[in-house]
Amino acid sequence: MELLLPHASNSCPLTVLGFLERAASVFGDSPSLLHTTTVHTWSETHSRCLRIASTLSSASLGINRGQVVSVIGPNVPSVYELQFAVPMSGAVLNNINPRLDAHALSVLLRHSESKLVFVDHHSSSLVLEAVSFLPKDERPRLVILNDGNDMPSSSSADMDFLDTYEGFMERGDLRFKWVRPKSEWTPMVLNYTSGTTSSPKGVVHSHRSVFMSTINSLLDWSLPNRPVYLWTLPMFHANGWSYTWATAAVGARNICVTRVDVPTIFNLIDKYQVTHMCAAPMVLNMLTNHPAQKPLQSPVKVMTAGAPPPATVISKAEALGFDVSHGYGMTETGGLVVSCALKPEWDRLEPDERAKQKSRQGIRTAVFAEVDVRDPISGKSVKHDGATVGEIVFRGGSVMLGYYKDPEGTAASMREDGWFYTGDIGVMHPDGYLEVKDRSKDVVICGGENISSTELEAVLYTNPAIKEAAVVAKPDKMWGETPCAFVSLKYHDGSVTEREIREFCKTKLPKYMVPRNVVFLEELPKTSTGKIQKFLLRQMAKSLP
């Protein structure tokens, strides 16, 4: 059998892009995307994506294979279509968080060398400001997204845009043959983790890793044919945990939501008989505590990730009719690679013990290869006793290719021993279930947004009154975590207040990155070598009101 080798007929590059073509054939007349008064079928979505890809590939634009095309917008049909259309043209898809400020946005556009940006009209002034910071020869062209009924008929900024999205699409050829990757290792998407510094973390995923992550999502959640999926999770967050492509594979009805509004969510769930949704723990908390909350007409499966929601939130959500699952993953894995697979015997446990079992992040998903907890120095596995801590490591097909333009960062996390080191701390239980004890020391996950503590610290250090600064995550019932800043001052005369520090940060950071708490200390705790002991600050943050 050693003479049997791979052949062109059995080694086609793996890619999720074919899911859309199949959806058009199998689910052609079924609704694919719904938003306000807009309804598209899968056949229409396929055609629209082909047209967009065709225009992107046209010689007049000059966008070559492997070059970056960015998307800045909320959960609207055009943003969903671009998850397919951009890579179908051979370009690399780059979703960007629209909540970033203009300076942060300009840093990402320059780092990615983006050639064209699709931007929602609500963010048009932001993007124009961001582009103005770039040298003229590095400025990408702009196309404005005009989903919905609130698009202005004209704008003073129209001259700055190449076209509207619909106009751009109409220029395309329906007969266009989408660009199949020559290799499944060809880059497909570029996602930034939390980064607005001069050295942002750009995570590159190949067609292969995206395919593996998407199949993972389908299998782990047992997503059936024709589910009704509510888009409460931003598509710009790791491509919606790969459900942008997974929903096409099963012909889902995608209900688009541009912002988290509890009454609207409950109304949409009832109106469309929603079956599935993903949400940050903060959204679950909002749904269970809002005056508009009401029992569901039929069960809704909810996938949440990040810090596990408190048992009280899970019980409240399940009382309303939500079937909650949670897991763990990173931008670097393209979605969830660990999930809390429930065991039947847990139902026989006392409520408190059952909640304890369910609060663990869980076990590797079916398609992922290996998850372990290892000593970061020796590289050896720690005891699987639920008590010995170590660094969480991954190995599997959905792990990224690496960090864009950052070989040192790539080598530091993807090491020669064959593991990807997450930077997160956890324990492994005897039954093989992982429990995260501490997220990466440099990341605060606030309402689903990744906030880099090092970036926030860099801003704090620009304040002339601050001598030392450290930012950690403070647990929060609503947001999951909020940034908490510990600072020591150059002068202890009481002239600097918490409010002044917060106002200072507001002038330099997006609103969501501003620390909710500022704690003044005479000196920050340090090791004998002078390193700030953040674990002590985290303990202090937990005790704050």
From Swiss-Prot:
It holds the Pfam family AMP-binding_C. Keywords: Fatty acid metabolism, Ligase, Lipid metabolism. Coiled coil: none annotated. It is an enzyme of class 6 (ligase). Transmembrane segments: none annotated. InterPro entries: AMP-bd_C (IPR025110), AMP-bd_C_sf (IPR045851), AMP-binding_CS (IPR020845), AMP-dep_synth/lig_dom (IPR000873), ANL_N_sf (IPR042099). The keyword Isomerase does not apply. Its EC number is 6.2.1.-. One of its GO terms (biological process) is fatty acid metabolic process. GO terms for molecular function: ligase activity. Expressed in roots, leaves, stems, flowers and developing seeds. Belongs to the ATP-dependent AMP-binding enzyme family. May act as an acid--thiol ligase that activates carboxylic acids by forming acyl-CoAs. This is Probable acyl-activating enzyme 4. It comes from Arabidopsis thaliana (Mouse-ear cress). The lineage of its organism: Eukaryota, Viridiplantae, Streptophyta, Embryophyta, Tracheophyta.
